[in-house]
Amino acid sequence: MGSSKSKPKGPSQRRRSLEPPDSTHHGGFPASQTPNKTAAPDTHRTPSRSFGTVATEPKLFGDFNTSDTVTSPQRAGALAGGVTTFVALYDYESWIETDLSFKKGERLQIVNNTEGNWWLAHSVTTGQTGYIPSNYVAPSDSIQAEEWYFGKITRRESERLLLNPENPRGTFLVRESETTKGAYCLSVSDFDNAKGLNVKHYKIRKLDSGGFYITSRTQFSSLQQLVAYYSKHADGLCHRLTNVCPTSKPQTQGLAKDAWEIPRESLRLEVKLGQGCFGEVWMGTWNGTTRVAIKTLKPGTMSPEAFLQEAQVMKKLRHKKLVQLYAVVSEEPIYIVIEYMSKGSLLDFLKGEMGKYLRLPQLVDMAAQIASGMAYVERMNYVHRDLRAANILVGENLVCKVADFGLARLIEDNEYTARQGAKFPIKWTAPEAALYGRFTIKSDVWSFGILLTELTTKGRVPYPGMGNGEVLDRVERGYRMPCPPECPESLHDLMSQCWRRDPEERPTFEYLQAQLLPACVLEVAE
């Protein structure tokens, strides 16, 4: 779900053609320890045109590197070396009076960048001053200001973006190399009858003199010159560069600089997305401009005071694979405002029409994204308590994010707090948590193992044919679910590690994330 404004309805994208003039030619709520010289591209394994599926079974579970992936380029950081003039990478429409609106390409002087994710800036163009989201700008005349530079994104994330069937052959981006410090990688979409849509990666090496090259016979003084050259000549690449890879605007960190507790009147509920035991989820808008998802909780579900206290902690959890908490209405009925994810809950996505086309590599990629988000939760010493497919949200390009972290602890419903009632997710809950209320990150690991069965069975309810009481009794006596049909034994072995009786013997999420990456992530061409 990436947020987008209601004007326009879809997420804003940016794309710039590099064709030379003389050429001819593309929800959630309802529903590091471990246990135990011609350019030679490193081609992506054969995908089909549907969703960029990889046909060949991956080396371990998935032939993807999904460590800490992102849905938009990482661009601006803290000011360094006295640089105070930045350029806008996207249009930004201010949502409150203290913010500053600007257009893509506008030059901005940074007045103060000490307040985290929102900087005080002065527009050279309009003469106005206000707060801007720091991830919408980059230092002027820097590589970060180039549309084709995507910074520190992973190989797998570049493939997820480039394998969009709407991209023409030659769509490209430049990113940091994952394997060589100081080097870059040129990732280019290609197509042929044998492999279908695929991505090739070329390592861009740096000369001692400061220049760049893919092959030593053709060298350039800057990355900009390299891109301009290969936009006119393939010269050993799979195809000359045609279009910059499109990407959505990044999420701002919060709705605005000081928007946290907001009035109910500022929200408009438009389309109901789902309903559950404790409330509903709506697609809506904030301040008439900003597309958001809104969770409405039934009165009595939780104490407003306890919720507000927990929300103060939750809003500090920021990771690319966690759904962002934007704002709250803290008086009953409580409203929770989060980023809008266009494809809804993972459970509904798996059971729906799109789920039919998902193959193992994509399912494992989704699992790795979830593990990445949970590894961050683990590092922050937080506990989710209700990790399951219904609480994972899906956006464009199969991006998955963890939602509803921490809310389960606050629910005051007797049928839920008894941990035996119909509303309590027994089938996803570790035995020590279900029986004794011992919720830890290790009970989240157990739940992740159950979530893996949901992925591999396209949303089947765990322990089919068994009631909650029977599940609790049999699991306590040592029963574990067998390997699902068409699930590799290696993946079932990972599930089994998550279901070890002793919580301390279960793996960490850091370990799980690593196991869901390819056995070797080296990029031959890099």
From Swiss-Prot:
UniProt enzyme class: transferase
Active site per database record: 386 (proton acceptor)
UniProt catalytic activity: L-tyrosyl-[protein] + ATP = O-phospho-L-tyrosyl-[protein] + ADP + H(+)
Domain SH2: 148-245
Disordered: annotated segments: 1-59
Domain SH3 positions: 81-142
Superkingdom to which the source organism belongs: Viruses
UniProt xrefs under InterPro entries: Kinase-like_dom_sf, Non-receptor_tyrosine_kinases, Prot_kinase_dom, Protein_kinase_ATP_BS, Ser-Thr/Tyr_kinase_cat_dom, SH2, SH2_dom_sf, SH3-like_dom_sf
Basic and acidic residues bias: start-end ranges: 16-25
Compositionally skewed regions (Basic residues) per UniProt: 1-15
EC number: 2.7.10.2
Pfam hit, one: SH2
PTM per Swiss-Prot/TrEMBL: The phosphorylated form is termed pp60v-src.
Sequence similarity: Belongs to the protein kinase superfamily. Tyr protein kinase family. SRC subfamily.
PANTHER family, sorted: TYROSINE-PROTEIN KINASE
The protein's name: Tyrosine-protein kinase transforming protein Src
Organism name: Rous sarcoma virus subgroup E (strain Schmidt-Ruppin)
